[in-house]
Amino acid sequence: MTRAPRFLALLALLPVAASGAIPGLDGGHIKLRWLGSSYPDDSAYREVFGQQTSDEYADLRLKFSGSRERFGFQADYQVIGQWGDSLDLPVDANGLLLLPPSLPNDDRRWWDLTDTISDNSSQGLVQRLDRLNVGYSGESTVLRFGRQAVSWGNGLIFNPMDFFNPFNPAAVDTEYKLGEDMFYGQYLLGSGSDWQGVFVQRRDEEGRATSEQRTTALKFHGFGLEAEYDLLLAENFNEFIFGVGGLANLGEAVLRGDITLTDARDGWVTSALVNWSWSWEPAGYNATVVLEYYYNGFGLAEDDYTPERILADKDLAERLQRGELYT
Protein backbone atom coordinates (compact mmCIF):
# COMPACT_ATOMS: atom_id res chain seq x y z
CA MET A 1 0.00 0.00 0.00
CA THR A 2 1.40 3.41 -0.94
CA ARG A 3 1.84 6.20 1.58
CA ALA A 4 -1.21 8.17 0.39
CA PRO A 5 -3.71 5.25 0.77
CA ARG A 6 -2.20 4.36 4.15
CA PHE A 7 -2.75 7.92 5.32
CA LEU A 8 -6.33 7.94 4.03
CA ALA A 9 -7.04 4.67 5.82
CA LEU A 10 -5.66 6.16 9.04
CA LEU A 11 -7.91 9.20 8.63
CA ALA A 12 -10.92 6.93 8.17
CA LEU A 13 -10.22 5.21 11.50
CA LEU A 14 -9.65 8.37 13.55
CA PRO A 15 -13.33 9.38 13.98
CA VAL A 16 -14.08 5.89 15.28
CA ALA A 17 -11.33 6.22 17.86
CA ALA A 18 -12.45 9.75 18.72
CA SER A 19 -16.12 8.85 19.07
CA GLY A 20 -15.63 7.82 22.70
CA ALA A 21 -15.87 10.08 25.71
CA ILE A 22 -13.05 12.50 24.92
CA PRO A 23 -13.34 15.57 27.16
CA GLY A 24 -14.09 18.71 25.21
CA LEU A 25 -14.49 17.04 21.81
CA ASP A 26 -17.19 18.94 19.95
CA GLY A 27 -17.25 17.16 16.60
CA GLY A 28 -15.16 17.34 13.48
CA HIS A 29 -14.93 16.09 9.94
CA ILE A 30 -12.94 14.17 7.37
CA LYS A 31 -12.90 15.51 3.82
CA LEU A 32 -11.38 13.90 0.75
CA ARG A 33 -11.18 15.92 -2.44
CA TRP A 34 -9.76 15.70 -5.95
CA LEU A 35 -9.21 18.97 -7.78
CA GLY A 36 -8.37 19.37 -11.45
CA SER A 37 -7.52 22.81 -12.80
CA SER A 38 -6.79 24.16 -16.27
CA TYR A 39 -5.17 27.51 -17.05
CA PRO A 40 -5.74 29.65 -20.18
CA ASP A 41 -2.90 30.94 -22.32
CA ASP A 42 -2.86 34.38 -20.65
CA SER A 43 -2.81 33.06 -17.06
CA ALA A 44 0.29 33.62 -14.94
CA TYR A 45 -0.37 30.20 -13.42
CA ARG A 46 0.05 28.51 -16.83
CA GLU A 47 3.69 29.57 -17.00
CA VAL A 48 4.15 28.18 -13.49
CA PHE A 49 2.23 24.89 -13.60
CA GLY A 50 1.51 24.24 -17.27
CA GLN A 51 -1.84 23.76 -18.94
CA GLN A 52 -3.39 21.54 -16.24
CA THR A 53 -2.87 20.43 -12.65
CA SER A 54 -4.32 17.55 -10.68
CA ASP A 55 -4.29 17.33 -6.88
CA GLU A 56 -5.78 15.13 -4.15
CA TYR A 57 -6.49 16.43 -0.66
CA ALA A 58 -7.35 14.88 2.69
CA ASP A 59 -8.40 17.00 5.67
CA LEU A 60 -9.10 15.87 9.23
CA ARG A 61 -10.44 18.43 11.71
CA LEU A 62 -11.20 17.72 15.38
CA LYS A 63 -12.96 20.54 17.24
CA PHE A 64 -12.57 21.04 20.98
CA SER A 65 -14.39 23.64 23.05
CA GLY A 66 -15.42 24.43 26.57
CA SER A 67 -17.18 27.17 28.49
CA ARG A 68 -17.81 28.29 32.03
CA GLU A 69 -20.21 31.12 32.74
CA ARG A 70 -19.20 33.91 30.33
CA PHE A 71 -15.80 32.50 29.38
CA GLY A 72 -15.04 30.05 26.60
CA PHE A 73 -12.21 28.14 24.95
CA GLN A 74 -11.80 26.80 21.42
CA ALA A 75 -9.15 24.59 19.81
CA ASP A 76 -9.33 22.98 16.34
CA TYR A 77 -6.74 20.35 15.44
CA GLN A 78 -6.05 19.66 11.76
CA VAL A 79 -4.16 17.09 9.72
CA ILE A 80 -3.94 18.06 6.04
CA GLY A 81 -2.45 16.00 3.24
CA GLN A 82 -1.96 16.92 -0.41
CA TRP A 83 -0.64 14.95 -3.35
CA GLY A 84 -0.26 16.31 -6.86
CA ASP A 85 1.10 19.03 -9.11
CA SER A 86 0.51 22.25 -7.14
CA LEU A 87 3.07 21.63 -4.39
CA ASP A 88 6.16 22.51 -6.42
CA LEU A 89 5.86 26.28 -6.06
CA PRO A 90 8.14 28.49 -8.16
CA VAL A 91 10.50 31.07 -6.66
CA ASP A 92 12.20 34.11 -8.11
CA ALA A 93 15.94 34.79 -8.13
CA ASN A 94 15.80 35.92 -4.49
CA GLY A 95 14.02 32.78 -3.31
CA LEU A 96 10.68 34.59 -3.01
CA LEU A 97 7.53 32.54 -3.58
CA LEU A 98 5.51 33.76 -6.54
CA LEU A 99 2.35 32.23 -5.04
CA PRO A 100 1.20 31.52 -1.48
CA PRO A 101 1.84 27.90 -0.40
CA SER A 102 -0.94 25.44 -1.14
CA LEU A 103 -0.56 23.82 2.29
CA PRO A 104 -0.86 26.24 5.25
CA ASN A 105 2.19 27.15 7.29
CA ASP A 106 2.86 29.58 10.12
CA ASP A 107 6.08 31.11 8.81
CA ARG A 108 4.59 34.61 9.08
CA ARG A 109 1.89 34.09 11.71
CA TRP A 110 2.49 35.33 15.24
CA TRP A 111 2.46 31.82 16.70
CA ASP A 112 3.99 28.80 14.99
CA LEU A 113 1.35 26.11 15.56
CA THR A 114 2.06 24.05 12.43
CA ASP A 115 4.24 20.93 12.23
CA THR A 116 5.34 19.82 8.75
CA ILE A 117 5.48 16.03 8.67
CA SER A 118 6.29 15.64 4.97
CA ASP A 119 7.06 18.22 2.30
CA ASN A 120 8.38 17.63 -1.22
CA SER A 121 7.44 18.39 -4.82
CA SER A 122 4.74 15.69 -5.04
CA GLN A 123 3.27 15.31 -1.55
CA GLY A 124 2.84 17.25 1.67
CA LEU A 125 1.49 16.46 5.12
CA VAL A 126 1.05 18.89 8.03
CA GLN A 127 -0.59 18.87 11.44
CA ARG A 128 -1.61 22.14 13.02
CA LEU A 129 -3.91 24.08 15.32
CA ASP A 130 -6.20 26.18 13.13
CA ARG A 131 -8.13 27.57 16.11
CA LEU A 132 -6.77 28.26 19.59
CA ASN A 133 -8.46 31.06 21.50
CA VAL A 134 -10.09 32.11 24.73
CA GLY A 135 -13.07 34.41 24.87
CA TYR A 136 -15.52 36.37 26.97
CA SER A 137 -19.17 36.98 26.01
CA GLY A 138 -21.13 39.61 27.93
CA GLU A 139 -24.57 41.08 27.34
CA SER A 140 -23.22 43.59 24.83
CA THR A 141 -19.51 42.75 24.61
CA VAL A 142 -17.55 39.93 22.96
CA LEU A 143 -13.78 39.58 23.40
CA ARG A 144 -11.56 36.85 21.95
CA PHE A 145 -7.80 36.39 21.98
CA GLY A 146 -5.86 33.82 20.00
CA ARG A 147 -6.09 32.04 16.67
CA GLN A 148 -9.50 32.62 15.12
CA ALA A 149 -11.21 33.72 11.91
CA VAL A 150 -13.10 36.93 11.16
CA SER A 151 -14.94 37.79 7.94
CA TRP A 152 -15.88 41.32 6.93
CA GLY A 153 -17.42 42.75 3.79
CA ASN A 154 -20.31 42.05 1.44
CA GLY A 155 -18.57 40.11 -1.31
CA LEU A 156 -19.85 36.66 -2.20
CA ILE A 157 -16.91 35.70 -4.46
CA PHE A 158 -14.38 38.52 -4.13
CA ASN A 159 -14.10 40.70 -1.03
CA PRO A 160 -11.90 43.85 -0.87
CA MET A 161 -12.91 44.53 2.76
CA ASP A 162 -11.77 41.07 3.88
CA PHE A 163 -8.01 41.60 3.73
CA PHE A 164 -7.03 39.55 6.82
CA ASN A 165 -7.19 36.10 5.18
CA PRO A 166 -9.80 35.99 2.41
CA PHE A 167 -10.90 32.85 0.64
CA ASN A 168 -9.49 32.15 -2.79
CA PRO A 169 -12.37 33.06 -5.17
CA ALA A 170 -11.86 29.67 -6.85
CA ALA A 171 -11.90 27.75 -3.54
CA VAL A 172 -14.08 24.64 -3.58
CA ASP A 173 -14.35 24.25 0.21
CA THR A 174 -15.25 27.46 2.07
CA GLU A 175 -16.54 25.97 5.32
CA TYR A 176 -13.54 27.15 7.36
CA LYS A 177 -11.19 30.08 6.90
CA LEU A 178 -7.60 29.75 8.01
CA GLY A 179 -7.23 31.16 11.50
CA GLU A 180 -5.09 34.21 12.27
CA ASP A 181 -3.54 35.19 15.60
CA MET A 182 -5.44 38.25 16.77
CA PHE A 183 -7.36 40.10 19.41
CA TYR A 184 -11.02 40.61 18.45
CA GLY A 185 -13.66 42.74 20.12
CA GLN A 186 -17.31 43.52 19.44
CA TYR A 187 -19.65 45.94 21.17
CA LEU A 188 -23.38 45.69 20.43
CA LEU A 189 -25.49 48.84 20.63
CA GLY A 190 -29.11 48.93 21.68
CA SER A 191 -30.20 49.76 18.13
CA GLY A 192 -28.73 46.51 16.80
CA SER A 193 -25.72 48.27 15.30
CA ASP A 194 -22.28 47.23 16.48
CA TRP A 195 -18.62 48.14 16.59
CA GLN A 196 -15.97 45.53 15.78
CA GLY A 197 -12.21 45.80 16.12
CA VAL A 198 -9.27 43.53 15.39
CA PHE A 199 -5.55 43.59 16.11
CA VAL A 200 -3.58 41.03 14.07
CA GLN A 201 0.12 40.49 14.73
CA ARG A 202 2.41 38.68 12.29
CA ARG A 203 6.14 38.04 11.91
CA ASP A 204 8.58 39.17 9.22
CA GLU A 205 10.97 36.94 7.25
CA GLU A 206 13.41 37.02 10.18
CA GLY A 207 10.76 35.78 12.61
CA ARG A 208 10.34 39.13 14.38
CA ALA A 209 6.90 40.42 15.42
CA THR A 210 7.22 44.02 14.23
CA SER A 211 4.75 46.88 13.81
CA GLU A 212 5.18 46.71 10.01
CA GLN A 213 3.53 43.26 10.05
CA ARG A 214 0.41 44.29 11.98
CA THR A 215 -3.17 44.91 11.03
CA THR A 216 -5.37 47.16 13.17
CA ALA A 217 -8.94 47.72 12.03
CA LEU A 218 -12.19 49.20 13.30
CA LYS A 219 -15.57 48.66 11.63
CA PHE A 220 -19.03 50.04 12.35
CA HIS A 221 -22.09 48.14 11.13
CA GLY A 222 -25.30 50.14 11.17
CA PHE A 223 -28.89 50.27 9.95
CA GLY A 224 -30.76 53.06 8.22
CA LEU A 225 -33.18 53.82 5.37
CA GLU A 226 -34.21 50.15 5.20
CA ALA A 227 -30.61 49.15 4.52
CA GLU A 228 -27.44 48.05 6.31
CA TYR A 229 -24.09 49.79 5.96
CA ASP A 230 -20.44 49.35 7.04
CA LEU A 231 -17.76 51.96 7.74
CA LEU A 232 -14.16 50.72 7.92
CA LEU A 233 -10.90 52.31 9.07
CA ALA A 234 -7.75 50.18 9.13
CA GLU A 235 -3.97 50.11 9.00
CA ASN A 236 -2.67 47.03 7.20
CA PHE A 237 1.09 46.49 6.82
CA ASN A 238 1.69 50.22 7.40
CA GLU A 239 -0.91 51.25 4.80
CA PHE A 240 -4.15 53.04 5.68
CA ILE A 241 -7.43 51.66 4.35
CA PHE A 242 -10.84 53.34 4.32
CA GLY A 243 -13.93 51.40 3.34
CA VAL A 244 -17.67 51.85 2.86
CA GLY A 245 -20.16 49.09 2.14
CA GLY A 246 -23.77 48.13 2.47
CA LEU A 247 -26.68 45.98 1.41
CA ALA A 248 -30.36 46.53 0.67
CA ASN A 249 -33.32 44.56 -0.58
CA LEU A 250 -34.18 45.10 -4.23
CA GLY A 251 -37.57 43.49 -4.62
CA GLU A 252 -37.07 39.84 -3.73
CA ALA A 253 -33.33 40.11 -4.41
CA VAL A 254 -30.44 41.54 -2.37
CA LEU A 255 -28.02 44.18 -3.64
CA ARG A 256 -24.63 44.50 -1.92
CA GLY A 257 -21.49 46.53 -2.45
CA ASP A 258 -18.13 47.61 -0.99
CA ILE A 259 -15.56 50.28 -1.86
CA THR A 260 -12.08 50.53 -0.32
CA LEU A 261 -9.37 53.19 -0.63
CA THR A 262 -5.80 52.12 0.18
CA ASP A 263 -2.86 54.49 0.70
CA ALA A 264 -0.35 52.39 -1.28
CA ARG A 265 3.18 53.15 -2.47
CA ASP A 266 2.15 55.13 -5.54
CA GLY A 267 -0.88 56.86 -4.06
CA TRP A 268 -4.47 55.98 -3.27
CA VAL A 269 -5.82 52.81 -4.86
CA THR A 270 -9.55 52.08 -5.21
CA SER A 271 -11.08 48.60 -5.22
CA ALA A 272 -14.80 47.91 -5.40
CA LEU A 273 -17.46 45.29 -5.91
CA VAL A 274 -21.19 45.09 -6.37
CA ASN A 275 -23.29 41.94 -6.41
CA TRP A 276 -26.91 40.90 -6.83
CA SER A 277 -28.40 37.66 -5.52
CA TRP A 278 -31.84 36.11 -5.78
CA SER A 279 -33.04 32.92 -4.07
CA TRP A 280 -36.10 30.79 -4.75
CA GLU A 281 -37.32 27.20 -4.33
CA PRO A 282 -38.00 25.41 -7.61
CA ALA A 283 -39.74 22.06 -7.02
CA GLY A 284 -39.02 22.36 -3.30
CA TYR A 285 -35.24 22.76 -3.72
CA ASN A 286 -33.23 25.83 -2.72
CA ALA A 287 -31.65 27.72 -5.62
CA THR A 288 -29.69 30.98 -5.76
CA VAL A 289 -28.49 33.12 -8.65
CA VAL A 290 -25.51 35.43 -8.00
CA LEU A 291 -24.05 38.13 -10.24
CA GLU A 292 -20.93 39.95 -9.01
CA TYR A 293 -18.68 42.59 -10.53
CA TYR A 294 -15.26 43.15 -8.92
CA TYR A 295 -12.73 45.87 -9.70
CA ASN A 296 -9.21 45.28 -8.36
CA GLY A 297 -7.35 48.57 -8.26
CA PHE A 298 -4.08 46.71 -7.74
CA GLY A 299 -4.50 44.65 -10.93
CA LEU A 300 -2.40 45.08 -14.05
CA ALA A 301 -3.80 47.38 -16.72
CA GLU A 302 -2.12 45.35 -19.48
CA ASP A 303 -2.69 41.69 -20.30
CA ASP A 304 0.94 40.73 -19.58
CA TYR A 305 0.48 38.30 -16.67
CA THR A 306 3.96 36.77 -16.56
CA PRO A 307 5.57 36.25 -13.11
CA GLU A 308 8.22 38.83 -14.03
CA ARG A 309 5.59 41.46 -14.78
CA ILE A 310 3.68 40.69 -11.59
CA LEU A 311 6.81 40.89 -9.43
CA ALA A 312 7.66 44.25 -10.97
CA ASP A 313 4.46 45.65 -9.44
CA LYS A 314 5.39 45.50 -5.76
CA ASP A 315 1.93 46.40 -4.41
CA LEU A 316 0.31 43.60 -6.39
CA ALA A 317 3.08 41.05 -5.79
CA GLU A 318 3.08 41.55 -2.02
CA ARG A 319 -0.68 41.06 -1.80
CA LEU A 320 -0.56 37.93 -3.93
CA GLN A 321 2.24 36.47 -1.82
CA ARG A 322 0.43 37.31 1.43
CA GLY A 323 -2.78 35.72 0.15
CA GLU A 324 -4.74 39.00 0.24
CA LEU A 325 -5.40 38.90 -3.50
CA TYR A 326 -5.68 36.03 -5.97
CA THR A 327 -6.21 37.90 -9.23
Label the model's feature ranges.
Residues 60-66, 131-137, 183-187, 218-222, ...:
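Residues on the lipid-exposed face of transmembrane beta-strands in outer-membrane beta-barrel proteins
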